[in-house]
Amino acid sequence: MKVIFNADDFGLTQGVNQGIVKAHLDGVVKSTTLMVGMPAEQHAVQLAKQLPDLKIGLHLRFTAGRPLTGERNLTDEHGVFTAYRDFWQRRDYQPEAIYHEAIAQVEHFLKLGLTLSHLDSHHHAHTHPQLAPIIYEVAKKYHVPLRDIGMAGEEAFGCRYHFTDFFYDQRLGIDPLMKHLLELKERFDLVEVMCHPAFVDPLLEKCSGYAKQREEELHILTSAQLIQLLVAHDIEITDYSALISAPLHSCV
């Protein structure tokens, strides 16, 4: 079985960026997704350009920060994206607004001089029933894979693929992670593990309720024990680059 450890939130804060880089250089992370238009975007880009083996995707934003397009249909009265707690209840999004914002974020990413490996989204926003079909079309337009959510048992990317958000908060630990991966190994060829390694900084503590746990994730993802166990169980660490030319399947 192959596993993609994808680090979300690249570009959120400098501490997040530095944690992701350490998880790449000293650990199992070979893939990350950048949040364009966020405070540490340029810092992330500078780091990324020094790391040719770190594959960079786009972490689409529809629940954090401000839209690049200024589309009012996507925001609250202050011009900020609809808060996460309200986002999932909304059913009045305009398809054109969603499409234009997604395209703007992809184009912004490309203008940074980075190679786009795949798409996913902050808070899994691309699985919202109004966003899902539109973001799928955006992924097709740019010929990149789109993170698959909740398709256990079905084929994606031409193989038995599964996305897991198991490695999070109360479930953090080498033993639970390995147990989970070995269970998945029975059924899947490719597993993507969502992760959030970081060094906690003041901005992260201010903007995220998930902060201290990120340092625990970083410790685990750079653990020699984890790397040895993956090798011992014939689990290969990979990234999205092998999937660029693979068939693109719907994420929902």
From Swiss-Prot:
Positions bound to Mg(2+): 59, 122
The enzyme's E.C. designation: 3.5.1.-
InterPro entries per UniProt: COD_ChbG_bac, Glyco_hydro/deAcase_b/a-brl, YdjC-like
GO biological process: polysaccharide catabolic process
Keywords, comma-separated and alphabetical: Carbohydrate metabolism, Hydrolase, Magnesium, Metal-binding
Disulphide bridges: none
Gene3D superfamilies per the UniProt record, alphabetical: Glycoside hydrolase/deacetylase
Names of the cofactor(s): Mg(2+)
EC top class named in words: hydrolase
GO molecular function (one): metal ion binding
Assembly notes: Homodimer.
Function: Probably catalyzes the deacetylation of acetylated carbohydrates an important step in the degradation of oligosaccharides.
Family, as annotated: Belongs to the YdjC deacetylase family.
Protein name, entry field: Carbohydrate deacetylase
Organism: Vibrio cholerae serotype O1 (strain ATCC 39315 / El Tor Inaba N16961)
